[in-house]
Amino acid sequence: MKKQLLAVLLCGALLTGCGTAAVPQQTGSGASGSAPEQPVVQRVDLDDFSFGGCASLSLAGNLAAAKAGDTSYEAAHDKAAFAGNSEEAWQRLLDGELDVVLAYAPSAEMQKKLEEQGISLVEVGTDALVFLAGSSPEEDTSLDWTKQDILTAYQKDNTSGWTGYAAAAGSDSRRIFAAVFGSDAPGVTMQSGEDTLTAACPHTTGTVCYTTWLSLLRNGKPNDTSIIAVDGMLPGDTAEEGKSYPLTVSYYLAVRPGLEQNDPAMLFYRWLGSDAGRTWLAEAVLPPAAEETGESDDMSQAS
């Protein structure tokens, strides 16, 4: 398992083809219509439209903006607006603050608001919930858990020897946890007046916390932690024999309604929402691309 993860994390820029990422099929996500095909990226000026989304997807979004704008990741980062959670991102689209949004699936209430405005979503990629086990440097922390093992670590007064720390309330990773496990994290251990649902994960021996795979690629893995395999699979593993990492989640693209087809926002939306755009994005977010961003390697708190 360590060898598989190492292979994913050490693929160089000249080997961006090593390993594959699942490319989801285009869907309407509860609304009619889908992004028209524009298989070849057409250069757009990032000053001519507003693009953003939730903070957890900033790696994917900034890479896409850099590609379409024919500019550097850093320049795209300065232009795009990736902050907050997905509900806030979808609201910014409704309010007209953003022309194009990249975010995780909205709540049922938000989905209804989007549909009422004629906004449909196009599935453009997959992310995953990743669990990190804290340990001492000298310990061997190669772990392979089941989903039930993870839930046990988050139960009050469990005897597993592990204490689960959840992400902040309202964060996308907290919502994804509830989606993939069917309920919110129930941990209630107190630490300096905070419970483990809100306290920053200390990444010490016996602690478990989580983030998203794309956030982990962007920020780096905290020291003295190991990624927990789930059902024998790591998030970077290539699916084989019908087996894949089980804790995955889709993310979506949407554009403000009423724009002309030659509007820069529409050109960008049609490219990224096309088969070619989704295929490119799946390859672009592989670890070598994350290394080229130059973002901080410190992730002191799950997001």
Each predicted region: which residue ranges?
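C-terminal motif of bacterial Sec signal peptides marking the signal peptidase cleavage site
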Residues: 14-17
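Positively charged n-region of N-terminal signal peptides that target proteins for export
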Residues: 1-9
